[in-house]
């Protein structure tokens, strides 16, 4: 039977739309330890020796360590008096490298500042320089030392997953550990790119995207079947053999055999036309159009590059942009721009080399890495990545041909992305200066935190915090707060905001104390603070912006006063104006009457943008919590049943209801379910 011989009777409805499944849930995401060789080392703790140096710091204290260092490869850490890691480095010879620091002759101000702040060092000796490089990259990502080149926005990449653990495989977006059986395609540059591709692939191959439990409980096809986005295998609208053909075609397309798939579909369309089956021919036509839509969004699809990541670096205005393009199976899966923190005095080769080592610390490595320019220790880096991947990884700088065109295109994108960022940073700086003037701040704020709540009649209440700074929104600093208190009256926004403030600033005091990081850094760095770009983003806010009026501000100020930090943080309230019109907002600042800003004031637009962003984040967090609550399973209530066992039980029995009816002997047959766990599940459903 043809995969497209489907029943045409309208059997689904709008209320039958299946719940979306997204395997990107960060709560379920596993942490993947980087694979590779075991790093054998001998730890040498020189801290007691440094402590005997009677308060010596800088080159003087480093000199006391050099004579006892081995002439062997390894990794070193430089730390200040507070125990903060300043720098992590690797060396072919620890003795020779540290001797350079001990001599007190520095090539740059950055190294001079770093050495002057050093009060102790720690060392790890490795078997090879390759192991030292891998360990260095891992430590830099974990410790984020001030004076290293640091990656930012290092979220893992999303993939497309075609499952292999069900008779009717589904297509999903996946991020995190590849623990589920199936075929993974990617990486993609963004979750949006994955979503668009999956939408087009569903139109082309009619693959399901519902949960297994939803699939098992269907008695009629859902809405996706009616709009020709699914073949309806759940209710037998297509045979298992026919559906398997569609899955095989999807795998061929994602594996780079797109021309073969398009040729076969085109031939089937021609045959349907000759048979005067124009309805079926139209379905094939739409499938071809969907495939063309996927490829039109891929841009460059090289003929001679099957699998490669392309990197290009551009430096300008004291900042760096590294553009990355991903090519798999001859297809362009997108690109992403990175803006690592790096001293402007560093050469591009050093920045790019350090970036690559950190980039692949926890990501799969392709067979080819193409660079716009060479990097330091390029051969060593290639050997290290090959060791980690368990196969040959080639790093090259193309000089001609299609590969050179790819690196040139990446370099052009890097230039344009950095140009846009420099323009945005300049504009952001002017806005922050205007913000400080408008609200009477001594200097432009470095960290602004914006807060809001979202709920429906008090249910699934969520507090949200977004963060903005000189470079715009800092999304890796965003936080959400699930409202926990049972004493808050449903819908009590004041009570919710009190809980959010208490949790946020109590934790901040516990983790960072009552010391302003900016002030401490300034005192330490002295006159060189202007040049020290390596300082981390501050944890303490200069300003908190509350979406609310006088009542909200009263609650917030009381919390800040109770915690003893009312004078540390400037709190500003923003209330919707008359008729809730944008432009009529009123602002509440301590010591001043409420006031409004001129309708066309750039600072007003800036504050509105901050408020809109926290609205978006709060509403999205609330919807996610509400959705999770709606699809909650009785299995979630059983202690000891986590996501893995829950998935195994649902795969075996189809539904939670079927699990509740199962005997202990049947439960024990499921992979991962011991006799003890089986009794736990059985007793949960059969307690009188």
From Swiss-Prot:
Q: What is this protein called?
A: UvrABC system protein C
The UniProt similarity line reads:
Belongs to the UvrC family.
Q: Does the keyword Secreted apply?
A: no
The organism's lineage is: Bacteria, Pseudomonadati, Pseudomonadota, Alphaproteobacteria, Hyphomicrobiales
Compositional bias ranges of the Basic and acidic residues kind = 1-14
Annotated source species: Mesorhizobium japonicum (strain LMG 29417 / CECT 9101 / MAFF 303099) (Mesorhizobium loti (strain MAFF 303099))
Q: Where is this region: Disordered?
A: 1-20
Xref: Pfam families: GIY-YIG, HHH_5, UVR, UvrC_RNaseH, UvrC_RNaseH_dom
Q: What is its main location?
A: cytoplasm
List keywords of the entry alphabetically: Cytoplasm, DNA damage, DNA excision, DNA repair, Excision nuclease, SOS response
Q: Which residues form the GIY-YIG domain?
A: 71-149
- Quote the Gene3D superfamilies the UniProt record gives: 5' to 3' exonuclease, C-terminal subdomain, GIY-YIG endonuclease, UVR domain, UvrC, RNAse H endonuclease domain
